[in-house]
Design a protein with these regions (language model features):
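Phosphoinositide-dependent membrane-docking surfaces
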Residues: 42-58
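A short, compositionally biased
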Residues: 22-28, 62-67
């Protein structure tokens, strides 16, 4: 009797295997891995709204990511640039987005959701 189990198959196109984000229905904070190499935990209790807009940089730079997702909290605004960001928007709507971080551009073709850049701007210094 063979008791060996096959290793789980992973695919970059599967949202569960995407290195740009993860989903967890039990999280209380969004972990933002910004491009400045800092990690920030923003509590969903301070979430205000999210806004999906076209990336205006596309007009000047044809290789720029096509979408921009703004995630606003009471003390910070997170800007996510990429493609296929609708899945992130849905996860935020349910407070299930566990983390978000950028991935190298070479993975963009294999990922349904590709995050090209993540920046954070704090709106209040002393809270």
């Amino acid at each position: 009797m063979n008791t060996n189990t096959n290793p789980p198959t992973t695919s970059p196109s599967n949202p569960r295997d995407n290195s740009c984000y993860d989903i967890d229905p039990t999280v209380a904070t969004l972990n933002v891995f910004a491009d400045d190499e800092h990690s920030y935990h923003l509590p969903y209790a301070q979430f205000l709204y999210a806004e999906m807009i076209p990336n205006l940089a596309l007009e000047k730079e044809p290789d720029a990511p096509p979408q921009k997702l703004l995630i606003r909290f009471a003390v910070a605004e997170v800007a996510v640039l990429g493609s296929g960001l609708k899945s992130l928007e849905r996860a935020i709507q349910k407070y299930e987005l566990k983390f978000v971080k950028s991935a190298d551009r070479r993975y963009a073709a294999t990922l349904k959701t590709h995050v090209a850049a993540v920046t954070i701007t704090f709106t209040k210094e002393n809270v």
